[in-house]
Amino acid sequence: MVDDVRHRARKRFGQNFLVDRQVIAAIISAIHPQPKDNLVEIGPGLGALTTPLLRLLNHLTVIEIDRDIVAQLQRDHSQDKLTIHSIDALKFDFSALGGDQRIVGNLPYNISTPLLFHLSRFCTYIRDMYFMLQKEVVERMVAEPSTSSYGRLSVMLQYRFAMEQIFTVPPESFRPVPKVESAIVVMRPLNKNAPVANDEALFSRIVTAAFSQRRKTLRNTLSAYLRGEDFNCLAIDANLRAENLTVRQYVSIADYCLSRSHK
């Protein structure tokens, strides 16, 4: 275990610090950083990943909201190799860091979902992302259609990224010890052949509406968008539920609704 736990974790920042050296080594190995990588770490905390990353990189950018941690990072590391942005990651403009970004981090559980949605806006600037998240969240991210874990988060993130759960991390690997298991997920932006909605805001509204009442059929949840004959045109069974549709089918629904509104 890493010995340095001087900083008291703050609940309002959702802080749980990774202290297991074996897990840290496994994460670094999975990331496989190269010296010239444009690598960004969100929430460096006590530097569990920061320190080994700096040994392998020419330069590292970190984003940290906790001013005490920022001060500690400034004391512990050379500013020639480390750029610190003291800001809430939810408000950070990742496009300012240029292209081909590799983003990593042990994300606070209390902001993980909104942060993933925020990052998805910058997917054209991103090569890949490696995150430690609550295991349940990762399972929802990578879930297949027609499973209980498949939901709005699955559809909206799979629309942008190919994702894979790499390995799980037990609660004992953190200080303080959380009540849940964690998992490492890798996210890579989809290539240009992936389906793209012509109106992404409409796509998002339709996905949200479909999953607003999971146990109801699409005939009910999408009644504001589709009538009986529309389901026939789309070759989609109106008696299915939201979790039964693929990302591509949601894109088809959004594009169909858009084309109909332009007639």
Q: Could you tell me what each predicted segment is?
A:
Residues 1-209, 229, 243, 248-252, ...:
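Catalytic cores of RNA-modifying enzymes
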Residues 214:
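Primarily a LysM-type cell-wall glycan-binding module
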Residues 221:
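Conserved active-site loop/cleft motifs that coordinate metal ions or position small ligands
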Residues 233:
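Nucleotide and nucleotide-moiety/phosphate-recognizing core
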